[in-house]
């Protein structure tokens, strides 16, 4: 089935797997989803991810992260900001702080996908893809 919003699909799959306390979830592999997974791993929101499959059927297997004996998800919430029907852009001075810096905003810039902190440090803006906290 063709998906119009691969980022929204990725966030929904991670959110649903977290709620069901699954160890892993599979996501169709694109350059964008791969970059977002790299940012989530670097920021400590997911344990790891690996690419599987061949040709058109490639997908990412994302290992989710939990804390404590009751396995509370590290990711409390994921929110899609810029959608296919309404794109949201921000320059470096307008980049949002998520929960006062506790969470991250993932930004698509001319230098690639990065967090709001990295974009602010480099002094560049871009499309605000999503919030994670």
UniProtKB/Swiss-Prot annotation:
Q: Which InterPro entries match?
A: Ribosomal_uS8, Ribosomal_uS8_CS, Ribosomal_uS8_sf
PROSITE patterns linked to this entry: RIBOSOMAL_S8
Q: Name one GO molecular function term.
A: structural constituent of ribosome
* Record keywords: Ribonucleoprotein, Ribosomal protein, RNA-binding, rRNA-binding
Q: Which Pfam families match?
A: Ribosomal_S8 (PF00410)
List the GO biological process terms: translation
Give the GO cellular component terms, alphabetically: ribonucleoprotein complex; ribosome
Give the domain of life: Bacteria
The record, for Gene3D superfamilies, names: 3.30.1370.30, 3.30.1490.10
Q: Which family does it belong to?
A: Belongs to the universal ribosomal protein uS8 family.
Q: Which HAMAP family match?
A: Ribosomal_uS8_B
Q: What does this protein do?
A: One of the primary rRNA binding proteins, it binds directly to 16S rRNA central domain where it helps coordinate assembly of the platform of the 30S subunit.
Quaternary state and interactors: Part of the 30S ribosomal subunit. Contacts proteins S5 and S12.
Q: What is this protein called?
A: Small ribosomal subunit protein uS8
Q: Which organism is it from?
A: Thermosynechococcus vestitus (strain NIES-2133 / IAM M-273 / BP-1)
The protein's gene is named: rpsH
């Amino acid at each position: 089935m063709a998906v119009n919003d691969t980022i929204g699909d990725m966030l929904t799959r991670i959110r649903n797997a977290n709620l069901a306390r699954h160890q892993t979830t599979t996501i169709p592999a694109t350059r964008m989803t791969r970059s977002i997974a790299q940012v989530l791993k670097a920021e400590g929101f997911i344990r790891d991810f690996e690419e599987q499959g061949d040709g058109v059927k490639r997908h990412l297997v994302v290992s989710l992260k939990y804390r404590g004996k009751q396995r509370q998800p590290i990711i409390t919430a994921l929110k899609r900001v810029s959608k296919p029907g309404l794109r949201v852009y921000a320059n470096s001075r307008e980049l949002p702080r998520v929960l006062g810096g506790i969470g991250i905003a993932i930004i698509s810039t001319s230098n690639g996908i990065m967090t709001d902190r990295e974009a602010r440090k480099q002094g560049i803006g871009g499309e605000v893809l999503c919030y994670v906290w």
